[in-house]
Structure formats: C-alpha cells, structure tokens
C-alpha cells in the first residue's frame, strides 16, 4: 500500500514542500488542497485559519484514507497545529521558519526573516527566535504582496522586479545581513530573484528539506492505512472555481497532479 499524504495551503506555495517530500517518497499518494477562496492567509484572523483548516482536513479524511497531513503554510502552522492534532488520529506536520539552522549558519548573527505579516507577529515565531536565536539580530519583513507575486510567477514564469524591489529595499544595503529565512512556503519560488537583488546575502534558507525528513521518518515508522482505494493518482483540490481555474489546473498538471477538483468548505 502506498501511504496517502495530504498537503494544504492557501495557494500553491505548498508545492515547494511537496517537491521536497516527493524526492524522498516518490511512490506516495499525494493530495494537494489549496484554499483559494481564502487566499492569502497572511493577515487572516486566527479563528478563521483554525476553522478552515479543520473543515478542509475533515473533508479530505472523509473521502480518503489519510496517513499524514502537512500544513504546508507557515502562517497557518503558527496557529492550527494544536487543534488539528487534538481532532485527528494521524500525524500532523507543520511548517515553521528555519530559525534554528539560520542561527547556526549565520556568521554575522544578523538574519533576515522574510515571511507574511501574520507569521512575523505570531507569538509562536517570537518564541522560536527567543529559544534558538537569542544572540542574533533578527530583521523582519512581512509581505502579503510577495505571496501574490509568486502566485503570478506560477502563471507567467516571471516576477516583476520593480514590484519585488520595494519589498526588500531595507535589506539591499544592509552592512551585516548574511542570512535570509524564507519564512513562507511561497518564497522559495522567488529565491532566484531575491539572490539577484540581495547579492551580499550568503544563505537563503527554507524549511522544505527539514519537513521532508520529518514526514519520511513518520511514514517509515507508522502503519499505513489499509483501506483500499480505486483512485491512486495524485489529486489536487481547491475551495473555489474562479477565472484562474483553467490556468491553475495546468500548473497542477506540471507538478504531477493530473486533475484539479473543486471542493468547497
């Protein structure tokens, strides 16, 4: 039996996490569910994120024998994990900014945290900084616009640098910044452009590989759901069908999801 793994995000940023996981578990059965009806999650209230996460996982668990769920969104992960772990019997893996490895890697101990506005203000993230980077200077930029720029890149293949530059302008001439944490699953898709605009930064870190390692460990040490399924191809779902649906379906096909379905909550 192939394990069934669900990943969910507000948009397609979670595909960066999926990409890392499938390198280690190429034969797993993947479900990807993006909440485009509530995109982006960046500044949504905690109660909205928890309610939608619960409903999305419940819908999928009702229809598919889930072995593991990945919350492939930093913003959601800062608030939804305790509730999901209380409700569901299977492992729930979250996505947190790579603060610990960044603190170990940075030579100047000046680190940039590039995330959504919601993520950089959450107590959970502030506690990670206190725990793992107490001796580091953490420069924070919270951006909803960059999430939207990445979604556009998935459709057009390019990011408008004239729109990206103002977002990270404060870091461009920073004398000691040597490490940037990509604290949103969308942002690895903008890594090339960020490297171009921030040539003095040595390290750009995201959590994708660490999540993949954690998922692999849990799958290898968990009994897989023995319920038989007729449909074993990877499937993608969204929460609303809008004027971007056909383009989004093509994008999901490129990432290994032959079919995009609408599953409202």
UniProtKB/Swiss-Prot annotation:
PROSITE patterns (UniProt xref): ASP_GLU_RACEMASE_1
GO BP annotation list: cell wall organization; peptidoglycan biosynthetic process; regulation of cell shape
Domain of life: Bacteria
Family matches, as SUPFAM superfamilies: Aspartate/glutamate racemase
Catalytic activity field: L-glutamate = D-glutamate
Residue numbers binding substrate: 9-10, 41-42, 74-75, 185-186
Keywords: Cell shape, Cell wall biogenesis/degradation, Isomerase, Peptidoglycan synthesis
Keyword Transmembrane on entry: no
Residues at the active site: 73, 184
EC number: 5.1.1.3
A matching Pfam family: Asp_Glu_race
Keyword Cell wall biogenesis/degradation set for record: yes
Top-level class of the enzyme under EC nomenclature: isomerase
Gene Ontology molecular functions: glutamate racemase activity
Pathway: Cell wall biogenesis; peptidoglycan biosynthesis
Protein purpose: Provides the (R)-glutamate required for cell wall biosynthesis.
Family classification: Belongs to the aspartate/glutamate racemases family.
Protein name: Glutamate racemase
Organism per entry: Haemophilus ducreyi (strain 35000HP / ATCC 700724)
Designated gene of the protein: murI
């Amino acid at each position: 039996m192939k394990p069934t793994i669900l990943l969910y995000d507000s948009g397609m940023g979670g595909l960066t996490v999926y990409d890392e996981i499938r390198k280690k578990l190429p034969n797993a059965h993947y479900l990807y569910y993006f909440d485009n009806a509530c995109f982006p999650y960046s500044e949504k209230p905690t109660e909205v994120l928890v309610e939608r996460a619960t409903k999305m996982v419940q819908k999928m668990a009702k229809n598919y024998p889930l072995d593991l769920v990945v919350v492939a969104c930093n913003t959601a992960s800062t608030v939804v994990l305790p509730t999901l772990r209380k409700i569901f019997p299977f492992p729930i893996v979250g996505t947190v900014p790579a603060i610990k490895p960044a603190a170990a890697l940075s030579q100047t101990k000046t680190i940039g945290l590039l995330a959504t506005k919601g993520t950089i203000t959450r107590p959970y993230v502030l506690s990670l900084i206190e725990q793992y980077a107490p001796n580091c200077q953490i420069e924070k930029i919270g951006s909803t616009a960059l999430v939207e720029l990445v979604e556009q890149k998935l459709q057009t293949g390019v990011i408008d640098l004239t729109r990206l530059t103002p977002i990270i302008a404060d870091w461009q001439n920073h004398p000691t910044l040597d490490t940037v944490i990509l604290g949103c699953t969308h942002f690895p898709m903008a890594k090339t452009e960020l490297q171009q605009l921030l040539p003095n930064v040595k390290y750009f870190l995201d959590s994708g590989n660490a999540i993949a390692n954690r998922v692999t460990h849990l799958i290898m040490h968990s009994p897989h759901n023995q319920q038989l399924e007729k449909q074993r191809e990877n499937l993608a779902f969204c929460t609303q069908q809008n004027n971007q649906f056909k383009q989004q379906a093509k994008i999901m096909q490129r990432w290994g999801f032959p079919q995009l379905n609408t599953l409202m909550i």
